[in-house]
Each structure stands twice: as structure tokens, then as C-alpha cells.
Amino acid sequence: MKFAVILLFSLVVLAVASESVEEVRREIDIEDLPEQQRGCADLRQPCTEGDDCSCCGSEGVCNCSHPHKKGCYCKTAGPLEKLAKKFRGCKNK
């Protein structure tokens, strides 16, 4: 019984690990696209500096001061950032 539980747990860990590797591959592919093609970026994806509207949805803003990443990436907006984005007239895509 213990062996079956350990085996099942190992399979779950392996599935989660392979999914995270696939996510990293997708992020790299998006970085290679020209700016026009990635104008609508998801959270944690590259965005256009100074253009919060390039982060789609009301939940994202463009952050260019990430301590561990070079460049600009969409991040989850705080309450004040969401209001500012709404008043800027960004169209949610």
C-alpha cells in the first residue's frame, strides 16, 4: 500500500514538473515575436514599456522594474493601478 501511495505521489510530482517546463518554453516563444504580434500580453509575459494597455484585461499592468528579469513584463495590478488603467481608457481584449 505504501509503495502504491509513493508511486502515485511521484507521478503527480512528475506531471506538475513537466507542465512548468512547458510554460517556460511558451514564454520564450512569445519573447521572440515582434512587438506588433505581442501587443496583447498575458500576465508574466513581455509588454510594451509605458503602455499598461498592452497588458490585456483589467488585472494587468506593465512593470519594467522587476528585480530578477530584464525588460518589461505584465504583472497583476493593485487596486489603484486598476482604477488608473480604467480611466486611461484601455480596451480589454
Curated annotation (Swiss-Prot):
Residues 1-18 form the signal peptide. It is found in: Secreted. Contains 5 disulfide bonds. One of its GO terms (cellular component) is extracellular region. Keywords: Disulfide bond, Secreted, Signal, Toxin. The keyword Secreted applies. Residues 19-38 form a propeptide. Disulfide bonds: none annotated. One of its GO terms (molecular function) is toxin activity. Expressed by the venom gland. Belongs to the neurotoxin 31 family. This is U12-lycotoxin-Ls1b. It comes from Lycosa singoriensis (Wolf spider).
